[in-house]
Amino acid sequence: MSIVRERLTPEESRSAALEAARALLIEAGPQAVTLKAVAARIGKTHANLLHHFGSAMGLQSELARHIGERVTRGIGEAVALARAGQADPREVVDRTFDAFGREGGGALAAWMIISGNRDALNPILEQIHNLVDRLGEGHDDRPVHETTLWLVLAALGDSLLGEAMAGALSLPKEKAREIARRHLIASVGLAEPRPRT
């Protein structure tokens, strides 16, 4: 009996590779995201991934873009709901902190900076900039750009050092999120959630 392998389209193959790379990033850190490891994870050859991404740097750049899309989509949805009073403003903070922490964005960013591959961060930075511009439309009275700057930097710092720093200060590991939530409510006037009826 022979096994028939379903042939993936180039886009499906790229998507599978990016999801595998993201899973490796979350499971084992950025050093585990290699063309060889991703290829093994999805049952493709190293040469196949070279064809799709050109190099390990190309894979990292695409992974950054992929993570950036997920991050900005989730944050944008959370902000819209919070502005309408349909979600706790904490959701905006949680999605931002999770993107850099649990989703591996902070480790990926730090690794790229340390390895000299800063250009690979451009897709994330561009997507965040576009999101902030959209969120700022009609809200000229709110410091959306400044709020985004401190929130992203707080989330990035928390992803890299937050738990250890909180422990050293005898604070709960979630303290940075609590502080960020208070600052977010104060700085942009997001509504507290309405009680559900």
Give the predicted meaning of each segment:
Residues M1-E12, P195-T197:
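N-terminal intrinsically disordered/low-complexity leader segments
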Residues A16, A20, L24-G58, E62:
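Helix-turn-helix
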Residues A16, E91, L108-W111, E146-L153:
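Amphipathic alpha-helical interaction segments
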Residues A20-A28, R73-L81, L108, M112, ...:
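Solvent-exposed, amphipathic alpha-helical segments
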Residues A56, L63, I67, V71, ...:
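Hydrophobic/aromatic residues within well-ordered alpha-helical segments
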Residues D94-H129, E163-M165:
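Amphipathic alpha-helical segments used for helix-helix packing
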Residues R118-H129, L135-T197:
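Hydrophobic/aromatic-rich alpha-helical bundle segments in the mid-to-C-terminal region
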